[in-house]
A protein has these predicted regions:
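Conserved helicase core region in the C-terminal RecA-like lobe
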Residues: 191-247, 251-262, 266-274
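Conserved short internal alpha-helix adjacent to the catalytic or cofactor-binding core
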Residues: 6-14, 58-65, 74-111
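C-terminal accessory regions
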Residues: 129-146, 238-309
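Accessory C-terminal helicase-associated subdomains
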Residues: 116, 122-223, 244, 300
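Conserved nucleotide-binding/hydrolysis micro-motifs of P-loop NTPases
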Residues: 49-53, 76-78, 239-240, 274-277
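Helicase P-loop NTPase motor core
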Residues: 1-65
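A short acidic (Asp/Glu
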Residues: 51-59, 82, 229-230, 279-280
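Extended, charge-rich low-complexity interaction segments
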Residues: 96-128, 203, 293-305
Length: 309
């Protein structure tokens, strides 16, 4: 990472005639890495512009082979929310008591939210533990049956009511602003339920899938700040993705090197000659040709071409 040295890892440039060839090549490469022991969540697909415009064919191709790739737009910020972190930890405890770290986190947060003195011996603490066990058992009973949207809604509300909306907002002042708190809750409620349905009601799998434990994340370069992955695929090294290059060359060069620095072992750039879903389907790399010159220098990148037969 950082400044790329030749022995830092593998760099490749895939040049494809169309999205289907690009998707097949990228998917095959990802599947090979997974078969060699790389976890899906340690592989990342990056785009300069909207991921759905560049990665849809790849998502479909991977799905055919049982690998899920997920555009992280809705999930990424949500997972960092304190209230979502609390929900997830609470649901982990409801699913199984074999998670002492999550259990301790919830107890300590309750002590703070309810203003209990931290003495574990006192009666108030014992009372809190009893109430916590009771509500955890109710949630456990709920999640052991197949939930519909209404039951899921009331289960979530019972967790919120237990901690207390006022207490939560006092602890996390950002939630006092307008409808922000309810927006976060509603977003979590619908996204998590989607995962729950997709996991056929298997609770711990729904939690893992919501966290992205088993999927290949897809995001913009901008959203990848501070993250590192074993393998990175930058989809769309094309003029139309870097449409403002002439006005902001330094910023866009930085983007190119950020893609390199996200990767621990390998980075692959793709250029697709024709993207049918785009306003201008035919793609070029005239404006950003310096990137191609760099990648095509001897010893830098392995260049592979995928052409219509």
């Amino acid at each position: 990472s950082g400044n790329w040295a030749e022995d830092d890892g593998n760099i490749a440039l895939f040049i494809a005639d169309n999205e289907q060839l690009e998707a097949a090549a990228v998917s095959k490469d990802i599947l090979l890495k997974i078969s060699n022991g790389v976890e899906p969540h340690d592989i990342c697909i990056l785009c300069k512009q909207k991921p759905q415009d560049y990665a849809s064919a790849i998502i479909e191709e991977l799905e055919k082979h049982g690998v899920r790739a997920r555009i992280e737009t809705g999930y990424q910020d949500l997972i960092k929310e304190p209230i979502v972190d609390l929900f997830i930890k609470f649901m982990i405890c409801a699913d199984s008591r074999k998670h002492p770290n999550e259990w301790t986190f919830i107890e300590e947060l309750l002590v703070e939210l309810w203003g209990i003195s931290g003495m574990r011996e006192n009666d108030t603490f014992d009372e809190m533990q009893r109430k916590l066990s009771a509500v955890v058992n109710v949630v456990k009973k709920n999640i052991q049956q197949k939930l519909d949207t209404e039951q899921w809604h009331s289960t979530l509300n019972s967790i919120i009511d237990f901690f207390g909306i006022g207490n939560i907002k006092a602890k996390f002042p950002a939630y006092k602003q307008g409808t922000y708190f309810m927006n976060v809750i509603n977003q979590f409620e619908s996204l998590f339920f989607e995962e729950y349905v997709a996991a056929h009601g298997v609770w711990n799998l729904a939690i893992e899938n919501f966290r992205g434990d088993h999927s290949v994340p897809i995001m913009t370069i901008h959203k990848s700040k501070g993250l590192e992955y074993n393998a990175v695929y930058f989809i769309g090294l094309e003029d139309s993705a870097f449409w403002n290059f002439r006005n902001q060359p330094d910023e866009d060069r930085c983007t190119f090197f950020v893609a390199l620095s996200r990767a621990k072992a390998s980075v692959t750039f793709t250029f697709c000659k024709k993207r049918t879903g785009m306003k201008c389907p035919m793609q070029r790399h005239n404006a950003i040709n310096e990137f191609f010159d760099l990648l095509q220098r001897p010893g830098i990148a392995e260049v592979k071409r995928f052409q219509n037969r």
